[in-house]
Amino acid sequence: MADSSIYSTLELPEAPQVQDESRWKLKAVLHRPHLSRFAMVALGLLTVILMSLLMYQRILCCGSKDSTCSHCPSCPILWTRNGSHCYYFSMEKKDWNSSLKFCADKGSHLLTFPDNQGVKLFGEYLGQDFYWIGLRNIDGWRWEGGPALSLRILTNSLIQRCGAIHRNGLQASSCEVALQWICKKVLY
């Protein structure tokens, strides 16, 4: 047998341009997750910044004593706002239980100082009048729905089982006596 070799020349069309285009498309597909991740992180940061600014604005606006911001909760008519609380100072007089019911009907409670702080400071703003507060003596002096009283309260008689406040501090009184009262409501 004779040794015969056949040679052929293979001519391929120039395809580097096609390969370059496919490489770019492949790179674009591979880089898309990085871009979407970057976009999500950027949007997340923007959201956090905007929420922080809104909270800061609310604190500045709503935290002021005499806030007039339209989006801040306001006190009902005839109530006085101080910080995040509304206070109602009655003009009429009722016994302690009727005063307690009045406040409850208004979604509030008789004024209390559960941490026993602020009694003296609050009393300085009151005149000569006595006001019922959420304090009574049932097995010891206790704030309504709260802890025991750790302050001194003036009392003259065993029938004085309800607490009142005036400019000189706390005073015990008979619960049937008609006094003005102070309700306290939390705004937010």
UniProtKB/Swiss-Prot annotation:
One Pfam family here: Lectin_C
Induction: By pathogens and viruses infections.
Predominant cellular place of this UniProt entry's protein: membrane
InterPro entries: C-type_lectin-like, C-type_lectin-like/link_sf, CTDL_fold, KLRG1, NKR-like_CTLD
Annotated keywords: Cell membrane, Disulfide bond, Glycoprotein, Immunity, Innate immunity, Lectin, Membrane, Phosphoprotein, Receptor, Signal-anchor, Transmembrane, Transmembrane helix
Cytoplasmic side: 1-33
Disulfide bonds: 75-86, 103-183, 162-175
A Gene Ontology term for the protein's cellular component: plasma membrane
Reported tissue expression: Expressed specifically on natural killer (NK) cells and activated CD8 T-cells. Not detected in spleen, thymus, lymph node, testis, brain or kidney. Not detected on mast cell lines, bone marrow-derived mast cells, or peritoneal mast cells.
Membrane topology: Single-pass type II membrane protein
SMART domains: CLECT
Motif annotated as ITIM motif, chain positions: 5-10
Domain C-type lectin per the UniProt entry, residue ranges: 82-184
Chain segments annotated as coiled-coil in the UniProt record: none
One MF annotation (Gene Ontology) recorded for this entry: carbohydrate binding
TM regions (residue ranges): 34-56
PTM characteristics: Phosphorylated in response to monoclonal antibody G63 binding and antigenic stimulation.
Residues annotated as glycosylated: 82, 97
Topology feature Extracellular, residues: 57-188
GO biological process: cell surface receptor signaling pathway; innate immune response
Localization per record: Cell membrane
Functional note: Plays an inhibitory role on natural killer (NK) cells and T-cell functions upon binding to their non-MHC ligands. May mediate missing self recognition by binding to a highly conserved site on classical cadherins, enabling it to monitor expression of E-cadherin/CDH1, N-cadherin/CDH2 and R-cadherin/CDH4 on target cells.
Assembly description: Forms a monomer and homodimer; disulfide-linked. Interacts (via ITIM motif) with PTPN11 and INPP5D.
PANTHER family reported in the protein's UniProt record: KILLER CELL LECTIN-LIKE RECEPTOR SUBFAMILY G MEMBER 1
UniProt comment concerning the protein's domains: Contains 1 copy of a cytoplasmic motif that is referred to as the immunoreceptor tyrosine-based inhibitor motif (ITIM). This motif is involved in modulation of cellular responses. Upon phosphorylation of ITIM motif KLRG1 associates with the two phosphatases, PTPN11 and INPP5D.
Protein name per Swiss-Prot or TrEMBL: Killer cell lectin-like receptor subfamily G member 1
Gene this protein is translated from: Klrg1
